Amino acid sequence: MLSWYKAQLAARPLLTQAVTTSILFGVGDVAAQQLVDRRGLSNHDLTRTGRMVLYGGAVFGPAATTWFRFLQKRVVVPGSTNKTILARVAADQGLFAPTFIGIFLGSMAVLEGTDVKEKLQKNYWEALSTNWMVWPFVQMVNFKVVPLDHRVLFVNVISIGWNCYLSWLNGQ
């Protein structure tokens, strides 16, 4: 299975990572509804899961893939691996995270037919501050030990819990 996935990454990296992200965003929402909200299968909101799947595959997966490639090529401190890692984490947490938390919440509001401004005012700072408690460490590990082609997958696996949280927060 791993060799098949690696072959897909080599042949179609953007598509493979978009599909992977789509699936794992869906898993995060199912976990949020079934394990956190304890909705039960009969009360599972398939539309909500569909929104997460759509956002993961159409927005976050391609964006994260492109972002990690950009960081790899453009954010480099010559002669210092550790400073390069810190610079990438700073860029990720100072630019990508604040932007994509806003895009996530705004996208969910649009797909739900609710007010974007209200959604952002209600949830943005809580999501971003929680992000800053979790993701800087995760990204340090990601940039230090995970090969570029597997960084989105690594983030997606960790994101099962994070997406569970975001899905729960979005549903509040």
Swiss-Prot record:
Localization: Mitochondrion inner membrane
The record describes its membrane topology as:
Multi-pass membrane protein
Instruction: Tell me, in one coarse class, where this protein mainly resides.
Output: mitochondrion
Which InterPro entries does this one have? Mpv17_PMP22
Q: Where are the transmembrane segments?
A: 13-33, 52-72, 94-114, 128-148, 152-172
Query: What is a single cellular component term in the Gene Ontology annotation?
Result: cytoplasm
Its GO biological process terms? ethanol metabolic process
Q: Which family does it belong to?
A: Belongs to the peroxisomal membrane protein PXMP2/4 family.
Q: What protein name does the entry list?
A: Protein sym-1
The gene that this protein is the product of is sym-1
